[in-house]
Amino acid sequence: MANKQNYYELYRKSTIGEALTDTLEELLINQYISNSLYQKILTQFDKTINEALSNTVKAKTTFKGSLHTYRFCDSVWTFILENAQFKTEANEIVKVDRVKIVACDANVQDAPPPK
């Protein structure tokens, strides 16, 4: 039997992930889809978005800032930077007061349960 790969649900909180979730919840409430289909679609989204980002995004960005907080739990790093500065390959600079960066171990077979 093949190993079932689990994916982080991190991108469900992105703009596209929230739009998908809102749409699916509306369909579920109006009984156009079942709860199992709802879960299956979200699981497929988790898989697809992770694979698409790892295979197609090639742009590089550097960043620096003052480390306010860091945490490591369940193979997930979380950093909160203050007065951060992001620099793109095109030398565009974006400054933000505070940013949260979440980094997940891509080699983890079993993603932790959502919190």
From Swiss-Prot:
Presence of keyword RNA-binding: no
Compartments, record wording: Nucleus
CDD domains per the UniProt record, alphabetical: TFIIA_gamma_C (cd10014), TFIIA_gamma_N (cd10145)
Keyword Transcription appears in the UniProt entry: yes
Pfam families, per database record: TFIIA_gamma_C, TFIIA_gamma_N
SUPFAM superfamilies associated with the record: Transcription factor IIA (TFIIA), alpha-helical domain, Transcription factor IIA (TFIIA), beta-barrel domain
Domain of life: Eukaryota
UniProt KW keywords: Nucleus, Transcription, Transcription regulation
Main location: nucleus
Gene Ontology molecular functions: RNA polymerase II general transcription initiation factor activity; TBP-class protein binding
GO biological process, one term: RNA polymerase II preinitiation complex assembly
GO annotations of cellular component type: transcription factor TFIIA complex
Function in brief: TFIIA is a component of the transcription machinery of RNA polymerase II and plays an important role in transcriptional activation. TFIIA in a complex with tbp mediates transcriptional activity.
Known partners and oligomeric status: TFIIA is a heterodimer of the large unprocessed subunit 1 and a small subunit gamma.
Entry's family note: Belongs to the TFIIA subunit 2 family.
Entries under PANTHER family matching the protein: TRANSCRIPTION INITIATION FACTOR IIA SUBUNIT 2
Protein name: Transcription initiation factor IIA subunit 2
Species whose genome carries this gene: Dictyostelium discoideum
Gene that produces this protein: gtf2a2
